[in-house]
């Protein structure tokens, strides 16, 4: 599901809100989440999961075109850990 599909489905379910209001709300939620993660804060949404940052240590990578070694610096990457409720729901519907 894309962001625009999410906005469309929410606007259909929440008929008292316009599509523009739903779009603005979704964008604001995502912006607040990005700001929290960029400050190193953990985001927990009970029943859904948590977002946090994981550190990737510096390493030597390879340029796929040339095969040449490339030094890659350490960095933080966003990580999502699904909650128990979400995992169970997904496993029920997929199985």
Swiss-Prot record:
GO biological process: DNA recombination; regulation of DNA-templated transcription; regulation of translation
Keywords, alphabetical: DNA recombination, DNA-binding, Transcription, Transcription regulation, Translation regulation
A single GO cellular-component term on record: cytosol
Gene3D superfamilies: IHF-like DNA-binding proteins (4.10.520.10)
InterPro entries given in the database record: Hist_DNA-bd, Histone-like_DNA-bd_CS, IHF-like_DNA-bd_dom_sf, IHF_beta
GO MF terms held by the record: DNA binding; structural constituent of chromatin
Function statement: This protein is one of the two subunits of integration host factor, a specific DNA-binding protein that functions in genetic recombination as well as in transcriptional and translational control.
Known partners and oligomeric status: Heterodimer of an alpha and a beta chain.
HAMAP family (alphabetical): IHF_beta
Name of the protein described by the UniProt record: Integration host factor subunit beta
Source organism per UniProt: Colwellia psychrerythraea (strain 34H / ATCC BAA-681)
């Amino acid at each position: 599901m894309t962001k625009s599909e999410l906005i469309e489905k929410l606007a259909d379910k929440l008929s008292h809100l316009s599509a523009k209001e739903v779009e603005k709300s979704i964008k604001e939620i995502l912006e607040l989440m990005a700001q929290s993660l960029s400050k190193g804060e953990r985001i927990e949404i009970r029943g859904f999961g948590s977002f946090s940052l994981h550190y990737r240590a510096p390493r030597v990578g390879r340029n796929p075109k040339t095969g040449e070694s490339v030094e890659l610096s350490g960095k933080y990457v966003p990580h999502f850990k699904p909650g128990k409720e979400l995992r169970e729901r997904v496993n029920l519907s997929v199985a």
